[in-house]
C-alpha cells in the first residue's frame, strides 16, 4: 500500500514539474568559458591556482574580496568551504560561501556556491599540459537570482562584470607568469 502511495506521489511530482506555471519565472542558466595559455610547468600552475589564498591575487581590487574564515592547509581539498565578502554592486558588501566539491590534482577542481549572490554557481578549473606550458580553462555555469529580473540583470551588467573579471585575471596571469621568465 505504501509503495502505491509513493508511486502516485512520484507521478504527481513529475506532472507538476512538467506543467508548473511557475516555470515561466525560472531563470536561464548561463555559461562562460575562458581559456588561457600559461608558459609555466603544470606543477607550477597547479601550485599557484590550487592555493585558495591566491584567489585574492586574481580578483580585481574594486570587488574588495575579504576571506571571512580560516583556510586550512595550503592546498584545496574536496569539502573545503571558503567564506568571503565581496562588493560587486555599488560597493554593497555581499556574503559568499563556496565549497570545493571535486579535486583531481594537476587536472581540475570545482567550486560551487553554497550561499551568495547567485541562484547557482558552478565553476570548473581545468589544467592541461601542452607544449611550452599549460592551457588553463575556466568553465562557469551560473544563474542570477530573481527569475526574469535576474536575466535582465545578466544582460545589463552581470555578464559584462564577469567578462571584466576574466580580462583582469588574464592580465594578472600574464604579469605573474611572463613569456620570458
Give the location of each predicted region.
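Glycine-rich portal/gate segments that line the openings of hydrophobic small-molecule binding cavities
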Residues: 67-115, 168-171, 175, 180-181
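Beta-strand/loop substructures that line and gate deep hydrophobic ligand-binding cavities in soluble
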Residues: 113-164
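Short, surface-exposed coil-to-beta transition loops
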Residues: 31-33, 93-97, 119-123
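A short, structured loop/turn motif at beta-sheet edges
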Residues: 42, 101-108, 126-135
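Hydrophobic ligand-binding cavity/cleft-lining segments
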Residues: 23-77
